[in-house]
Structures are given as C-alpha cells and as structure tokens.
C-alpha cells in the first residue's frame, strides 16, 4: 500500500463471551474458531486498509470482558481513537451492560469530550435464532446515549464485520475533519488582535 498511513487505535469492549475476539480475528485473518477461549487481559492485531481514499493502519485491541480482568484491560484504553461497544443479540444482560462499558471507557481513557468521541455499537451473533434484543431496542439505546452508529454483525457468518471496522475508521476521520475545520475557523487577525471566522466547537 502506497502513501502515508494513519495509525488508528480501536478498542473492542463488552461482556465476556459476546464475540469480540471472533470479530477481530474474522476481520484480520478471515477465520472463525467456534472453540475460541475467553481473552485474558488484552490482545491486539493490525490490519491495513483504505477508506474513502485514506490509507489507515488499524490497531485493534480486544479486551477481556470479565470483571476480574478490569485492572489488566483499563490501562490500554488511553490513546484509543474509537471504541466499539459490543453486545450479543442473544444475551440481554450484555446489552444492558453497554452503559457501564461506555462509562468505564470514558473514565479510564480520560476522554476530554465524551459527547464527540467516536463510539460504534455492534450487536453481534445475529446468526443466532434465540434473539433477546431487537434491532429497534439497540437503535433506541444508540440514539439516547450519543447518537452512535449501530451495526448488527456475525463473526461466524462474516456479516457486516468489514463494514463495522470501516465505519469505525469513518467515525474517527469525521471527528478529525471537524476538528481541523474548527481550527481553520479560529484564525487571528494580527493587525487588530481580533479573531476572525466563526467557531464551530
């Protein structure tokens, strides 16, 4: 891949067993292991991609969802460019815990502007028949908690996996573009000492 690549750090967060490792492995290696064990601590994989003409190296961090691994995973939140809040559509509790994961990330990642931080919500395991969370419920949660993009995925069937990670990149680039626009709008007239342009931040 030619051209300068932008390094983006993306964190997968959610309860243990919702399929975070499977999503990461499906996206990076295009493999699915139905016998995969729970993650202990953190793991990460890289993948290069091009989104809307931008070359990106995506560094995907998969974190252990169990409470006992909290002290191992939280130091790795810092420096994240995007967070993929993940639940399993056949596990109602994992959906109800999304708010806790959101708060944990914002606190430990030391997010300065939570309202504009790029979160993407993934409802995984849509290949399962015994669904406990409807699409409408998940979309409503996303609208009420930050107007986040919502995608339904299946690492097993490779449903929307690539789309999900590309959406994460687009969300980061959109925030970056907005910040650049704001900075350009804050030009200063050196002669009068007054600011020119309007603020969008």
From Swiss-Prot:
| Covalently lipidated residues, kind S-geranylgeranyl cysteine | 200-201
Give the main location. Answer: membrane
A cellular component term from Gene Ontology for this protein is: phagocytic vesicle
**Membrane-related topology note:** Lipid-anchor
Q: Does the keyword Nucleotide-binding apply?
A: yes
Q: Which UniProt keywords apply?
A: Cell membrane, Cytoplasmic vesicle, GTP-binding, Hydrolase, Lipoprotein, Membrane, Nucleotide-binding, Phosphoprotein, Prenylation, Protein transport, Transport
Record-level GO BP terms: protein transport; Rab protein signal transduction; receptor-mediated endocytosis; retrograde transport, endosome to Golgi
Q: Which domain of life is it from?
A: Eukaryota
Q: Which parts of the sequence form the motif Switch 1?
A: 31-42
Q: Which residues bind GTP?
A: 18-22, 33-34, 36, 38-39, 65, 124-125, 155-156
Reactions mediated catalytically: GTP + H2O = GDP + phosphate + H(+)
Q: How is its activity regulated?
A: Regulated by guanine nucleotide exchange factors (GEFs) which promote the exchange of bound GDP for free GTP. Regulated by GTPase activating proteins (GAPs) which increase the GTP hydrolysis activity. Inhibited by GDP dissociation inhibitors (GDIs).
The cross-references to Gene3D superfamilies, in alphabetical order and at most eight, read: P-loop containing nucleotide triphosphate hydrolases (3.40.50.300)
Residues with the Phosphoserine modification:
34
NCBIfam families named among the record's database cross-references: small_GTP
**Reported function:** The small GTPases Rab are key regulators of intracellular membrane trafficking, from the formation of transport vesicles to their fusion with membranes. Rabs cycle between an inactive GDP-bound form and an active GTP-bound form that is able to recruit to membranes different sets of downstream effectors directly responsible for vesicle formation, movement, tethering and fusion. RAB9B is involved in the transport of proteins between the endosomes and the trans Golgi network.
What this protein is called in its record is Ras-related protein Rab-9B
Q: Which organism is it from?
A: Homo sapiens (Human)
Task: Supply the gene name.
Answer: RAB9B
């Amino acid at each position: 891949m030619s051209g300068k690549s932008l390094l983006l750090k993306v964190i997968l967060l959610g309860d243990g067993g919702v399929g975070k490792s499977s999503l990461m492995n499906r996206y990076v290696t295009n493999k699915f292991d139905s016998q995969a064990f729970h993650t202990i601590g953190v793991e990460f994989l890289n993948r290069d991609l091009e989104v809307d003409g931008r070359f990106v190296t995506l560094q995907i961090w998969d974190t252990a969802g169990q409470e006992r691994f909290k002290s191992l995973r939280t130091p790795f939140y810092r420096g994240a460019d995007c967070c993929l809040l993940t639940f399993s559509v056949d596990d109602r509790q994992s959906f109800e815990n999304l708010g806790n994961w959101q708060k944990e990330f914002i606190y430990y990642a030391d997010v300065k502007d939570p309202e504009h931080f790029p979160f993407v919500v993934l409802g995984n395991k849509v290949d399962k028949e015994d669904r406990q969370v409807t699409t409408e419920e998940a979309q409503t949660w996303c609208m009420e908690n930050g107007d986040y993009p919502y995608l339904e995925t299946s690492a097993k069937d490779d449903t929307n996996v690539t789309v999900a990670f590309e959406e994460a990149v687009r969300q980061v680039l959109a925030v970056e573009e907005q910040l650049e626009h704001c900075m350009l709008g804050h030009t200063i007239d050196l002669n009068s000492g007054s600011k020119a342009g309007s603020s969008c931040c």
